[in-house]
Amino acid sequence: MAEERIVPMRLQRFLARAGVASRRGSERLMTSGRVTVNGQVVTELGSKVDPLVDVVAVDGIVCSIAEKPVYLMLNKPAGYLTTMKDPQGRPTIVDMVPTDRYPGLFPVGRLDMDTTGLLFFTTDGQMAQELLHPSKHVWKHYVAHVVGTPTEEQLNRLREGIELEEGPAAPAEVEIVSNDAKMKALLAPQGLGKTGGGEPNSLVSVTIREGRKHQVKKMLLAIHHRVLALHRDTFGPLHLTGVKEGEWRLLTEEEVAALERTIGREPGASPIMPLHASK
């Protein structure tokens, strides 16, 4: 029986299947001149590629369609941008994850440059879109090292949904954890919980289901407590365990199944369709 030929596909479909972005997002990447095929910039949306022959890259990073999606977590240290490429040459998270081994790997959501902790990566574009969609209400847990100690009245403002410049934040789960010895021991490697400059400070646990830019910092500043350091240790069902700062690990089957349940996908169902032509 003759081997089946892999079907050439539209470039934006290839990018979506490689987990780079959604189909529409892939089109924007193309029209902005960030996509190359065999070293040549391609902006025409009708362009096709052969996954077995053509070399496709976005911002210089080669993309490919993996047989199975890849899922991993990084324990991000401070001082790295959550981007795959920085025009100014600053350190980025791409320096710490195996993009050469897993082409198409990208972060789901962002952490500020000075924020540490759990950052989830995948080649599964569909899962990424679902997890970031507001309707999924994916909870994220942070511990903030802040100047001063918020009062119960101030914490209640966060629990009720505090007004920010860009609109009200959804209600958050917050509590003071400064006296939690286990929490302080856990955060010691990140430098959280240490006093400095003679200023009184505290550790505040913050759990939110939104993902606005600088959201936790803005929320705490709105109650007059500046964030000195911020660390994230959960993202949905994922917990930052077994990963030293600056290192990564692949997710377990149980963790992937938990993510699939979070987005309403049957555990074990692969979003990657076969590349071979079907009759």
Per-range role (PLM):
Residues 2-279:
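Basic, flexible Lys/Arg- and Gly-enriched helix-loop patches that mediate nucleic-acid binding at interfaces
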